[in-house]
């Protein structure tokens, strides 16, 4: 199929993903702050029992504790281990939770045994917003990002028909060099560059384009189906 507009290709891919099990409600133009709140909401829903969050939502500083743990993970392997680790610990500082205030609790983040079932959530982010690290650069906006239980794990850049897929990958490389994939976005495990007739998959921080199929270790067989 020919797409003369990148936006049409983007909408078509969203439609395919939705048909394959990704949530139909698309998160549009979300910033890192928005995505953190989305993740906090999912963590709350999956951990609201008395032994965990005791039906009291996570505070901003509790989410910051999780971010700080992520920022200590310097390699893709360790970041992948975080995603697959099934749980993360925080010290409760929500004063409303008198049962756990000041105590360490463990939160369920993801269980790959629950793929397409249980408490798993699979969301699409359209045109996510990335703040740049330099005042000399404008903030960036990606094409698509895929979230599993609120965690960004796949980033997709698209080009319309007639534009080489290498240009989409070069865009990802540019974002990487600008430090876009840090903070919450450092959890991204797979980059996907696409034009309507060709797709390139690459693990994070690989500096060359390799057209090799990748089975994502968190349990997805492909980005198109759950």
Describe the residue ranges of each PLM region.
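An alpha-helical interface "stripe"
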Residues: 1-226
């Amino acid at each position: 199929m020919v797409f003369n507009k990148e936006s049409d290709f983007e909408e078509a891919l969203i439609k395919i993903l939705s048909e394959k099990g990704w949530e139909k409600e698309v998160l549009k133009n979300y910033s890192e702050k928005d995505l953190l709140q989305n993740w906090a909401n999912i963590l709350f829903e999956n951990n609201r029992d008395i032994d965990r969050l005791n039906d009291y939502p996570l505070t901003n500083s509790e989410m910051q504790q999780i971010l700080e743990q992520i920022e200590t993970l310097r390699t893709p392997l360790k970041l992948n281990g975080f995603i697959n680790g099934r749980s993360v610990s925080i010290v409760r500082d929500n004063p409303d939770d008198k049962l756990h205030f000041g105590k360490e609790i463990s939160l369920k983040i993801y269980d790959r045994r629950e793929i397409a079932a249980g408490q798993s959530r699979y969301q699409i982010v359209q045109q996510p917003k990335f703040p740049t690290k330099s005042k000399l650069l404008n903030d960036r906006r990606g094409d698509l990002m895929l979230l599993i239980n609120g965690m960004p794990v796949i980033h997709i850049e698209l080009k319309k028909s007639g534009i080489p897929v290498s240009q989409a990958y070069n865009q990802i490389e540019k974002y990487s060099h600008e430090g876009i994939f840090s903070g919450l976005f450092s959890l991204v495990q797979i980059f996907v560059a696409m034009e309507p007739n060709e797709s390139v998959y690459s693990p994070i921080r690989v500096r060359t384009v390799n057209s090799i199929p990748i089975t994502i270790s968190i349990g997805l067989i492909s980005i198109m189906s759950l």
